[in-house]
Amino acid sequence: MFTIVGTVTPSARSRGHSADDVARTALRILDDDGLADLTMRRLATRLDVQPSALYWHFPNKQSLLAELSDRIVGRAASLLHGSGVVAEARALRDALLAYRDGAEVVSSTLALGLGSPAALDRLTAAVAAEGFSPDVATRAGTTLLHFVLGHVWHEQQRLQYDSVGVVAPGATPVCDADFAFGVDLIHRGLHASASRPA
């Protein structure tokens, strides 16, 4: 009698891991080591599968990053304190800061037209709730989104450079007050422009 011993293909092995497992592991690598070190090969090694097995769940790295972006942005709702434009901007910032290179992941995903528009939708809805037209709300929401992403990207780069001691002595630190000032400036400017006669 013969016993046939089969080999487990990468695709079959990947079924032991769900898309959620893959995404959660990728987020851990991102948080521990940064976006530059989040490679499909490294992720596969961490999951003990062949790199090709990851494509069972995500057809390419961009789709994986889009999933990570959605998860990062999705945290904003749970971090929201209060309501309104300023509260939404702060919650998004906190969500981005929760993961190393969070702003870069979300920004690059949105630039490629991938991922959920949840961040923009929430900011736009907050502006619209203050009585602005859909067109103005969308433009203001986009402006706020770009400010938050840019500010946090700068913050996160500064934190990394500080951690390895390469920031020039006497360089001005990035602080919460700078972020609050920027959001307030956009918010007040929006209301000021609406009150000016045409």
Describe the function of each predicted region.
Residues 63-95, 173-197:
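N-terminal hydrophobic signal/anchor transmembrane helix of membrane proteins
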Residues 20-28, 32-33, 46, 63-80, ...:
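Alpha-helical structural segments
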Residues 50-53:
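Key DNA-contact positions within bacterial/archaeal DNA-binding proteins
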Residues 64, 68, 88, 101-102, ...:
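Residue-level detector of well-ordered alpha-helical segments, enriched
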